[in-house]
Amino acid sequence: MEKFLDEWSLRILRELYKNSKISYKKLSKKVGISVTSCYYKVRDLEKQGIIKAYTIEIDAKKLGFPVKTLIEVKTRTGVSTEVVKVLGKYPNIFKIYGITGDKDVVIEAYFRNIEELDLFLKRIREICLDIKDTETHIVLNEHRNPKGWF
């Protein structure tokens, strides 16, 4: 049975989602509980595996990778570890998702330009014979719920 979180824990998660570097003192003020309670709630969230990591968000455009793509891949055998293994070798790929529907995999990847994207698509089709078809979407803009999805 799933354990539902109390309102304080949800508030903590929302604040950490906005800024994972926030101090316990500032976090406790924003959430409205003592620093000690805040510390223990965060520790409990970590122990439960709800908080898996504290990370950063990188601006790919400022790194010289302005072309963000979502590439749908249809394979001959469904989601195979071989396809994921081959695709995982490319540094342009940020995430690989196994999905339901007409396609088997969605790749989130970043490129310097359209030519680099085109070369990538040609290479993966040559190297990974299990890839039957791809459909590429270039992300024009991105919108995020500032409160988080939870």
Where are these regions (language model features)?
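A compositional/biophysical signature of low hydrophobicity enriched in polar/charged and small residues
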Residues: M1-F150
